[in-house]
Amino acid sequence: MPHYQVVKGARDIFPDEILQWKHVEGVIHRLAALYGFNEIRTPVFEYTELFQRSIGSSTDIVGKEMFSFLPDPSGRSITLRPEMTAGVMRAALQKNLLAAAPVQKLYYISELFRKERPQAGRQRQFSQFGAELLGVSSPAAVAEVITFMMHVFEDLGLQGLKLRINTLGNMDDRKRYRDALRNYLAPCYEQLDDASKERFEKNPLRILDSKNPEMQQIVKDAPKLYDYLGREALDDFEKVLFYLSARGIPFQIDHRLVRGLDYYSYTAFEVTSSALGAQDALGGGGRYDSLAVELGSSGEVPASGFAVGMERLLIAMQKQGLFSDLDAAAPSVFVIVQQEELFDQALEIVTTLRRAGISAVIDLAGRSMKAQLREANRMNAANALFVGSDELASGKCTMKDLRSSLQDEYFLEEIIDKFRKPEPLNRLRS
């Protein structure tokens, strides 16, 4: 076994799997452009207090899962980002983006870090794609980010998805509900697990989000947040549902749904996949108008967004066989060197083809012609271009279509011209 191994909770992604990542990323980039979202990239680390203020001190992320350290000369703690929304909002406020354009539609595909117990689809270094729509508080804006997310899933071919949605109301609604929930849970306090006891004091709504079956049994008859909502939140939620229905997006109302981050208000949603088993969450999001105030803004910034775990997304697609038709990019031409002393001339041909925009490779190991052909077939090259003394003397090269086995002789300029025409090169004369 090699002396050095990959760090626990991280993983290597090799070329065969990179092909799958590129496919998914390509769909995301294409649909983001269709919806008018622009890509943003933020630093992988931020000051720790950014996440303490935004995510919430009662969350598992802040309490247990952040990678924090003290490299800054000022003594301020820095944290590898565990989520993207806080950093995106920080960047938007710092750059004053909304002054330039009152509506900002941003998306990202980024690396994140959490001290989680490594398991399938959950690593300590992981990737998310997501979107943030800033500057608009309307239900149509919430429906827009959900529609974008679901459109990505649809274009990727995913089946067995369920969109669960709820409203968390505004701050006053949640205060009334927190009081009612604490009153309900107080007689059961000693039966709560340690995490739920801590949440009881800081944010009892998080107990509803517990994955502990015993906690789920305790809260199954708890008051429903929906019963404590004011007219404003109810009307807002009904409009979100209306827009989703109008766009043909099926959903399931789940009054127990709360998100694991404290900054959400009004609409919250989550998407699950039947392909992921018991840990079925694929992604989710919601509205977070008050986040900007927590980060020092003088007023609220209307905002909605979502995040989806890329690793979990790929696992769901793999289990549904959605990558079976993907083929690695194959070279158009594999240049076969027939005599070792002709390598330099063959390399010049490869360079000429590449500069003409034609994908071309050459064997760099000095192997036999038979071994070169085997390598060309292994790489699924479309054509083999034979370079020998006879070919160089005549100024022509023999080109063989490796799929049809048809071949003919061509001047190099002819080969380049054929690749530039709409008809494929492999239509060679017998």
From Swiss-Prot:
Keywords: Aminoacyl-tRNA synthetase, ATP-binding, Cytoplasm, Ligase, Nucleotide-binding, Protein biosynthesis. One of its GO terms (cellular component) is cytoplasm. InterPro entries: aa-tRNA-synth_II, aa-tRNA-synth_II/BPL/LPL, Anticodon-bd, Anticodon-bd_dom_sf, His-tRNA-ligase, HisRS-like_core, HisRS/HisZ, HisRS_anticodon. The keyword Hydrolase does not apply. Its main location: cytoplasm. It holds the Pfam family HGTP_anticodon. Gene3D superfamilies: Anticodon-binding domain (3.40.50.800), Bira Bifunctional Protein, Domain 2 (3.30.930.10). Disulfide bonds: none annotated. Its EC number is 6.1.1.21. It is found in: Cytoplasm. GO terms for molecular function: ATP binding; histidine-tRNA ligase activity. One of its GO terms (biological process) is histidyl-tRNA aminoacylation. It catalyses: tRNA(His) + L-histidine + ATP = L-histidyl-tRNA(His) + AMP + diphosphate + H(+). SUPFAM superfamilies: Class II aaRS ABD-related, Class II aaRS and biotin synthetases. The keyword Cytoplasm applies. It is an enzyme of class 6 (ligase). Homodimer. Belongs to the class-II aminoacyl-tRNA synthetase family. This is Histidine--tRNA ligase. It comes from Chlorobium limicola (strain DSM 245 / NBRC 103803 / 6330).
